[in-house]
Regions:
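Alpha-helical transmembrane segments and immediately membrane-proximal extracytoplasmic
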Residues: 1-280
Length: 280
């Protein structure tokens, strides 16, 4: 667990600095958005170069824990490079998924290196996920729990709890030693809890659940449509990049490109536009 925390935590720390750098470059040079389709071509080329043409992302990490699917170590540099390229040119790829894939592939590689059995190797995958997530977001306890939860909704792998916590804390220590601090969103006051607020929170929870379901359905359906109309992955990614450019031009700004941290800050400040969730 300590080794996983050091290695995956180091990778997560490097990933953090990489994300910070490309975001800064994109912010200073907004014209980079017009190179997004070409960045997509580079990403597809990288995956094909390493013979990983059918990558399934985070799903592959989860499958590796459940059904012993092969989780190649080459996924680490692929997800690292492709995520940085995506954000450099204005794409919006979630850092959470990248952290899980990066850490999971490193954890699996460590498990293979020490010839662990399947059970211990699965724990190492979760340790790697926890470590990378912790280093990137600065939330060691949340990283440990999240990595165990995401593997199977409603089921907790308690045998992995202590190793994941250790990996997360080690990774967090490494990140802090390099000067990384977690992003804080301060709330001035919290309203008292009562019947009225309970009803509002319940309605909000239902709406968020509905939007989440709709978002997942749209992701799967759009992927199927892209593959149906554009068989060639190079054409597919180029068209996708062009669509993002058109949407960005229609919105008139790049507030919805990249990580979306600015949108979270606006939500906390109460200055966010009502349709921001839909535009994002």
């Amino acid at each position: 667990a300590i080794i996983s925390g050091v290695v995956a935590g180091g990778a997560g720390t490097l990933f953090y600095f990489g994300m910070t750098l490309v975001t800064l470059i994109r912010t200073k040079h907004p014209w980079l958005i017009f190179l997004l389709p070409f960045g997509g071509l580079v990403i597809v080329g990288c995956y094909r170069l390493l013979h990983d043409e059918h990558d399934t992302g985070t799903n592959l990490v989860i499958s590796a824990i459940h059904s012993d699917d092969n989780l190649p170590l080459k996924m680490a540099p692929l997800i690292f490079i492709s995520t940085l390229i995506t954000h450099l040119f204005g794409g919006s790829a979630g850092r959470e998924g990248a952290a899980l894939q990066l850490g999971g592939s490193i954890g699996n590689g460590i498990g293979k290196l020490f010839h662990f059995d399947d059970k211990d190797k699965h724990i190492m995958i979760m340790c790697g996920m926890s470590a990378c997530f912790s280093a990137l977001f600065g939330t060691p306890m949340a990283a440990a729990i999240f990595s165990m939860e995401v593997v199977s909704v409603g089921i907790m792998y308690y045998a992995a709890l202590v190793p994941c916590v250790i990996s997360s804390l080690v990774a967090h220590g490494i990140a802090v030693s390099f000067g990384i601090s977690q992003e804080l969103f301060l709330i001035d006051s919290i309203p008292s809890f009562g019947i009225g607020n309970a009803v509002r929170i319940s309605v909000l929870a239902i709406l968020c659940a509905g939007i989440s379901i709709l978002f997942c359905v749209m992701l799967h359906q759009s992927e199927a449509l892209y593959k149906h109309f554009f068989k060639n992955p190079y054409v597919r990614v180029f068209v996708g990049g062009c669509i993002v450019i058109v949407l960005t031009l229609l919105v008139g700004n790049q507030n919805y490109n990249g990580t979306g941290v600015n949108i979270i800050a606006q939500c906390i400040d109460g200055t966010v536009r009502p349709e921001a969730f839909l535009l994002k």
